[in-house]
Amino acid sequence: MGTYTLECAGCRHTIPDNYTLRCECGAGLIRARYTARQISPRDLPGMWRYYDWLPTRGHLDTPGAPVTFKSQGLSKELGLKELYISFNGYWPEMGARMDTCSFKELEAPPTIVRAREHGGRAMVLASVGNTARAFAYLSTLTGFPVVIVVPRKSAHNLWIPGREPGDSIKLITMEEGNDYSDAIRLSERIAGIEGVMPEGGARNVARRDGMGVTMLDAAVTMKRMPDDYFQAIGSGTGGIAAWEAALRLRDDGRFGDRLPKLHLAQNLPFAPMYYAWKAGRRDIIPELDMPEAKKQIEAMYTDILSNRNPPYGVTGGVYDALIDTQGDMYAVTNDEAIRAKRIFEKAEGIDILPPAAVAVAALLQACDRGLEKKRTVLLNITGGGLERLRKEVSMSMVKPCLNVEGPEVPLENITKAIQWQTLSKKS
């Protein structure tokens, strides 16, 4: 059993875990402190190999896990001799079976298990695509009820691989003009309904430590931590997760004593964390860093990488992760991402999702700026294999139970649409 305590990154106090998402001090993110100082992979399915560093008592029989391998094609293209790829998606011959084609499939299992273990009857979350798909898939597999809120333009991302969507999924779409932050606002209101538990976003240790499995798997495979870690970010939760996993690996003592340098990328024109970081600021100033946020988001290559309220300046957040790892941020244009996608797919022989292409573009920028060829680099391909999956696996769309104009919709409309009495009795 992966035993742990919770500690606030702000006040450093130990906190009891009652599916706790916030410390009373309000100063920082909560972290899990695990009893197991060293990671010992278990004989368990998928990501649960790293059970000792996941904040749950039980586990699920889910096969999804990252696959880490040494690049041949892209490494030759870039002249990087020690380039490793963490592939999160569908690529059967490589052993990759994240059938939702996104590393968000690492978030959902421990989050749902943690919620169940703390008496959760249902969960609500907001998303613009990959997170929603992962939780919908896990809801279908487990029967655990989820209420998912997405902008209607993102509803095409809600499909279930290999089976029909479960009745446990209640999808609410929002009219045109609403974005991820509007979906978050509505989900926060829905979490006020009795019996509905908030998913928690970046504040949920299960979500972060689930994504941290990417770094754990890479270190175990490589027998060391990388020198450099590249990932595209929207909220930055994945970057925080990589940093926290690296801190544990450093304390483990077998994978090196230097933290990987984080290279985190945003997709222009919406890149508030990039602008704040380059200005040397801990805080995002909306009028400077995202002056026309909704218009900027509409112009992105991948609006999955958008969040108007990211955990950037909070203690234990993205800013601290970059400072602690001597990291850097990148701004990637749409054309750069499209070009990077073509380069990767030709070099490695598998399709990748747009957010992963942004990470590849950041790596190309770093190489152009003189990234040392001898450094050990880990590139997180956060999603891929979708085109391959479409040819080999059936996909069923999740149908919405309600479409709303905005986040201030009367809650009685929500309660009626999700058939709350039925939903709350399932778990």
Swiss-Prot record:
Gene Ontology biological-process annotations: coenzyme M biosynthetic process; D-serine biosynthetic process
Listed cofactors: pyridoxal 5'-phosphate
Catalytic activity entry: O-phospho-L-serine + sulfite + H(+) = L-cysteate + phosphate
Enzyme class: transferase
N6-(pyridoxal phosphate)lysine sites (modified residues): K104
A GO MF term: cysteate synthase activity
EC code(s) of this entry: 2.5.1.76
Keyword Transport appears in the UniProt entry: no
Subunit structure: Homotrimer.
Entry similarity comment: Belongs to the threonine synthase family. Cysteate synthase subfamily.
Function: Specifically catalyzes the beta-elimination of phosphate from L-phosphoserine and the beta-addition of sulfite to the dehydroalanine intermediate to produce L-cysteate.
Protein name: Cysteate synthase
